[in-house]
Curated annotation (Swiss-Prot):
The keyword Translocase does not apply. GO terms for biological process: neuropeptide signaling pathway. The keyword Secreted applies. It is found in: Secreted. This is Abdominal ganglion neuropeptide R3-14. One of its GO terms (cellular component) is extracellular region.
Length: 85
C-alpha cells in the first residue's frame, strides 16, 4: 500500500507562507514602518469627528417636530462619548 508522505505538502505551505510574508514586509517597508497604523488611526479619528459634525448639523435642537424625541434619546443613551483607547 502507498504511505502518504505529507512532508512535501508542509514544505509547499511553508514556502508559500514565507513568500507572502516577505511580500507584505517589502510593501510595508516602502513607507516608514509604523506608517500603516498611524494612517489607520488618523482615518478612524477623522471618521468619528465627521460623524459628530454631521450629527450636530442634522439634529439641531429647537422647537422642531422631533426635538422632544431627540432630547429624550440623548438623555437616555448619554450621547456618544469617545474614549481614546
Amino acid at each position: 500500500e502507498e504511505v502518504f508522505d505529507d512532508t512535501d505538502v508542509g514544505d509547499e505551505l511553508t514556502n508559500a507562507l514565507e513568500s507572502v510574508l516577505t511580500d507584505l514586509k517589502d510593501k510595508r517597508d516602502a513607507e516608514e514602518p509604523s506608517a500603516f497604523m498611524t494612517r489607520l488611526r488618523r482615518q478612524v479619528a477623522q471618521m468619528h469627528i465627521w460623524r459628530a459634525v454631521n450629527h450636530d448639523r442634522h439634529h439641531s435642537t429647537g422647537s422642531g417636530r422631533h426635538s422632544r424625541f431627540l432630547t429624550r434619546n440623548r438623555y437616555r443613551y448619554g450621547g456618544g462619548h469617545l474614549s481614546d483607547a
